[in-house]
């Protein structure tokens, strides 16, 4: 368990919740400061919604462009750094040690070492750490055997899981995670070529689904790795208690999105940005934001309450699909926020991203924060 650093609480005002009823959307709607239209899915028994309680505290500081927080089943935590290609281990006193460097990472613009995921071993081994990263000519996913124990974690040589994901200075996607079905999911951006998103022969602009070793699993809608398409730059994925996959996505100039992901779904990019009324067979987002209020990256779900980290928006969004409630937390308190995950003991962890070249870092940035969440 991490020991919280004393004297690091930061006070932030409690927001007033905002709710709205979905209106009939139009493809040419003018952006409002925040569009809070949320569709309400059917659910058996809704879990009580949760929200942050009290002030966030700093768990660790001195991170360099952190990208992904990976909490292991043992309670240990690893954090990827985009530009250094380092995986850092969080120690109980809040300090950080280098667990290792991921080989072949070539940082460039928004590319570098991005998402992390973990697969427990089924043969008595410690399991596998998966990494999504930008190499010299493509984005790729590797897996590395986890070695050592808490306080001395490391990993062995990587073996390829997937190569050939389109690469660019931006729009690289990069989030990975194992779903409740045991399959590995990955978000792939359009690599700055909008046409990739509608091209089913391209891995770009997609959410991908694969076996732990990179093969096409049974049940994929096109008998390829493509699970959904029509995405611009999705950077967050998470599953609710019903096994439903959700994804956050960067828009271009008008709308950022939160999408409920269905197998084979076409989410519209580049034909549609934001809510387009369902024309052309495109699936509308369940939520959209003006880009200066979001630029969403990491996504976490706690008791079916969604939390979304926002970069340009510099806030943590809380979304309740069951009621249509959307509200911002900690606006401008910590700068750009890159990732958010469920923490230990009824907490939420999130990491700032002010050292990524687009923020205004303060001394000690970037930081990992913890805040309690409760109904």
What are these model-predicted stretches?
Residues 1-2:
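Sec-dependent N-terminal signal peptides
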Residues 9-15, 22-193, 244-251, 293-330, ...:
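Acidic, Gly/Ser/Thr-rich repeat motifs that build Ca2+-stabilized beta-propeller blades
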Residues 144-153, 208-217, 261-269, 273, ...:
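Short loop/turn segments immediately following beta-strands, especially the blade-tip
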Residues 226-255:
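Repeat-solenoid scaffold signature
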């Amino acid at each position: 368990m991490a020991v919280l650093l004393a004297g690091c609480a930061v006070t932030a005002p409690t927001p007033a919740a905002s709710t709205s009823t979905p209106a009939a959307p139009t493809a040419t709607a003018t952006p409002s400061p925040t569009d809070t239209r949320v569709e309400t899915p059917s659910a058996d028994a809704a879990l009580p919604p949760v929200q942050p309680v009290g002030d966030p505290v700093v768990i660790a500081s001195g991170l360099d462009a952190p990208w992904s927080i990976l909490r292991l089943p043992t309670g240990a935590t690893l954090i990827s750094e985009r530009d250094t290609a380092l995986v850092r281990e969080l120690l109980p006193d809040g300090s950080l040690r280098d667990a290792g460097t991921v080989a072949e990472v070539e940082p460039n613009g928004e590319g570098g070492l991005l998402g992390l995921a973990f697969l427990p071993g089924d043969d008595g081994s410690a399991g596998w750490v998966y990494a999504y990263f930008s190499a010299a000519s493509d984005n790729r996913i590797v897996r590395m055997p986890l070695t050592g124990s808490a306080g001395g974690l490391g990993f062995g040589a990587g073996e390829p899981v997937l190569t050939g994901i389109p690469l660019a200075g931006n729009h690289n996607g990069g989030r990975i995670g194992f779903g409740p079905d045991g399959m590995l999911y990955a978000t792939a951006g359009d690599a700055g070529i909008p046409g990739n998103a509608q091209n089913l022969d391209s891995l770009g602009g997609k959410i991908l689904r694969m076996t732990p070793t990179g093969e096409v699993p049974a049940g994929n809608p096109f008998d390829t790795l493509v699970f959904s398409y029509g995405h611009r730059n999705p950077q967050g994925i998470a599953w609710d208690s019903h096994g439903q996959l959700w994804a956050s996505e960067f828009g271009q100039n008008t709308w950022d999105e939160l999408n409920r992901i269905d197998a084979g779904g076409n989410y519209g990019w580049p034909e549609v940005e934001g809510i387009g009324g369902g024309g052309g067979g495109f699936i509308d987002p369940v939520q959209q934001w003006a880009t200066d209020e979001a630029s969403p990256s990491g996504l976490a779900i706690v008791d079916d309450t969604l939390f979304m980290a926002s970069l340009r928006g510099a806030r943590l969004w809380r979304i309740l699909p069951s009621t249509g409630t959307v509200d911002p937390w900690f606006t401008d308190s910590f700068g750009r926020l890159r990732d958010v995950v469920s923490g230990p003991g009824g907490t939420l962890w999130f990491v700032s991203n002010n050292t990524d070249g687009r923020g205004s870092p303060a001394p000690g940035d970037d930081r990992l924060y913890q805040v309690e969440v409760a109904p």
